[in-house]
């Protein structure tokens, strides 16, 4: 059996890809989103109540659809990274990366020795299709896409070095954490924050890597697309449900 291709990684050098945050932590909700036309979904393990089994259920639900899953971890824990890779995650997003040294350690956590220190699960893992994928350990890195998040002043200052780290495929900017750290809470459109976002984008592209960002507001998303961001999350499932519910109720209750 051949190693499954990673459609998210394959599409990074094409047109802007639009995605949605998936926070309900169920395969049922993720599968509904997969039918709507989004190019990718972020299965959020940082702020949503996801654990390894719920992430697995969502990966399985999305497998039948042309909607690529991206899995975000809660932290930099190599043991968790190993588990997420073993259940078949091919595109992994890691939050709060501030230095190239951190980025290099994360790359190593996704690679087998001698190029890293990922543990060997063999036939126990969905990633190998329980041993059916030939030469999995030798080629797994080819379809792995590692995205690191820059969402602090330190990360922005080190964006060039982070982006240049071998094995890092993309940088994802966290505009809301950036705006909070700089004292512009809830205002990622503040000129200071916008300048930091633009700097990170330029540094990422200068290194030949892809850049992504979260932009639930349409005006922001369109501006970032014009700037050249390669992948943009334009919605959050929980927010979309709440907004639709509020609009429905308001039509009847005023």
From Swiss-Prot:
The keyword Metal-binding applies. It is an enzyme of class 4 (lyase). Its cofactor is a divalent metal cation. SUPFAM superfamilies: Phosphoenolpyruvate/pyruvate domain. The record marks 72 as: Transition state stabilizer. It catalyses: D-glyceraldehyde + pyruvate = 2-dehydro-3-deoxy-L-galactonate. The active site is at 47 (proton acceptor). InterPro entries: Aldolase/citrate-lyase_domain (IPR005000), HpcH-HpaI_aldolase (IPR050251), Pyrv/PenolPyrv_kinase-like_dom (IPR015813), Pyrv_kinase-like_dom_sf (IPR040442). Keywords: Lyase, Metal-binding, Pyruvate. PANTHER family: 2-KETO-3-DEOXY-L-RHAMNONATE ALDOLASE (PTHR30502), 5-KETO-4-DEOXY-D-GLUCARATE ALDOLASE (PTHR30502:SF4). Belongs to the HpcH/HpaI aldolase family. This is Hydroxypyruvate/pyruvate aldolase. The lineage of its organism: Bacteria, Pseudomonadati, Pseudomonadota, Gammaproteobacteria, Oceanospirillales.
């Amino acid at each position: 059996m051949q190693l499954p291709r990673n459609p998210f990684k394959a599409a990074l050098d094409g047109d802007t890809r639009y995605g949605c945050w998936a926070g309900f932590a169920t395969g049922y909700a993720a599968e509904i989103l997969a039918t709507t036309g989004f190019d990718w979904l972020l299965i959020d393990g940082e702020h949503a109540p996801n654990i390894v089994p719920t992430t697995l259920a969502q990966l399985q639900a999305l497998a039948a659809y042309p909607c690529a899953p991206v899995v975000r971890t809660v932290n930099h824990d190599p043991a968790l990274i190993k588990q997420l890779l073993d259940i078949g995650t091919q595109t992994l997003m890691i939050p709060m990366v501030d230095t190239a040294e951190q980025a290099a350690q994360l790359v190593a956590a996704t690679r087998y020795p001698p190029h890293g220190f990922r543990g060997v699960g063999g036939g126990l893992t969905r990633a190998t299709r329980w041993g059916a994928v030939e030469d999995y350990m030798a080629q797994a890195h080819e379809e792995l896409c590692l995205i690191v998040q820059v969402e602090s002043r330190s990360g922005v200052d080190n964006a060039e070095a982070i982006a240049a780290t071998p094995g890092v495929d993309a940088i994802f900017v966290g505009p809301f954490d950036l705006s909070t750290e700089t004292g512009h809470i809830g205002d990622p459109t503040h000129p200071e924050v916008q300048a930091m976002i633009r700097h990170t984008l330029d540094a990422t592209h200068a290194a030949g890597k892809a850049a992504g960002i979260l932009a639930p507001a349409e005006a922001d998303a369109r501006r970032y697309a014009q700037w050249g961001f390669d992948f943009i999350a334009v919605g959050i499932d929980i927010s979309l449900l709440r907004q639709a519910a509020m609009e429905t109720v308001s039509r009847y209750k005023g």
